[in-house]
């Protein structure tokens, strides 16, 4: 029994730190809506940690003296850091769900066949779709730039200048550079 007590204490201590880490991670999603876009875009789930920090920065940035520009710049930096973690696979963001079991090449081939079939038709809408398709980025870094541009152009109304200090207490670790 003498040996069991220290082991139980150690397990309890590790369990508490794990619970604190989980709780702290969960608190960072309190003011976040993820990478909300009207469309399902590539990298949306992969960029979610950066989006959570960005959303918290927009909600609580003024309380901690972080400007909207600083939030947006940190957002781009965080997304580029995520892209660099992909290493040589930085051409595309990892897929989620069922597509994870397929290779990146197989998924790309399947996508290109679907696009080719859809765009081979000669309608006006398909001509427009072809134009848009060729403007879309093909790399993780390209998508990061697009997400960054989107918040720069359309995020002004979301940056909060009237946030209550009480709602942001304990969220310092959810902000850029903290």
UniProtKB/Swiss-Prot annotation:
Prodomain residues: 98-130
List localization entries. Answer: Secreted
GO terms under cellular component: extracellular region
Signal peptide per UniProt: 1-24
Reaction catalyzed: a 1,2-diacyl-sn-glycero-3-phosphocholine + H2O = a 1-acyl-sn-glycero-3-phosphocholine + a fatty acid + H(+)
InterPro entries named among the record's database cross-references: PLA2_conodipine-like, PLipase_A2_dom_sf
Cofactor names from the entry are: Ca(2+)
- Positions carrying 4-hydroxyproline: 38, 42, 49, 137
UniProt keywords (A-Z) are: Calcium, Disulfide bond, Hydrolase, Hydroxylation, Pyrrolidone carboxylic acid, Secreted, Signal, Toxin
Main subcellular location:
secreted
Record-annotated active site = 54
Cite the record's note on assembly. Answer: Heterodimer of an alpha and a beta chain; probably disulfide-linked.
What this protein is reported to do is described as: Catalyzes the calcium-dependent hydrolysis of the 2-acyl groups in 3-sn-phosphoglycerides.
Instruction: Please give the family membership noted in the entry.
Output: Belongs to the phospholipase A2 family. Group IX subfamily.
Tell me what this protein is called: Conodipine-P2
Species whose genome carries this gene:
Conus purpurascens
List the taxonomic lineage.
Answer: Eukaryota, Metazoa, Spiralia, Lophotrochozoa, Mollusca
């Amino acid at each position: 029994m003498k040996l069991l007590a220290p082991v139980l204490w150690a397990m309890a201590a590790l369990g508490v730190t794990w619970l604190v880490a989980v709780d702290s991670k969960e608190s960072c999603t309190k003011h976040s809506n993820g990478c909300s876009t009207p469309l399902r875009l590539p990298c949306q789930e992969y960029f979610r940690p950066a989006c959570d920090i960005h959303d918290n920065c927009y909600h609580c940035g003024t309380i901690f003296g972080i400007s909207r520009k600083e939030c947006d710049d940190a957002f781009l930096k965080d997304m580029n850091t995520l892209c660099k973690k992909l290493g040589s696979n930085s051409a595309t963001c990892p897929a989620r769900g069922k597509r994870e079991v397929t290779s990146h090449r197989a998924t790309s081939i399947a996508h290109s066949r679907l696009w080719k079939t859809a765009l081979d038709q000669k309608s006006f809408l398909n001509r427009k779709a072809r134009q848009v398709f060729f403007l879309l980025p093909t790399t993780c870094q390209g998508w990061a730039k697009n997400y960054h541009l989107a918040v720069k152009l359309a995020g002004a109304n979301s940056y909060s200048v009237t946030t209550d200090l009480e709602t942001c207490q304990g969220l310092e670790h959810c902000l850029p550079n903290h």
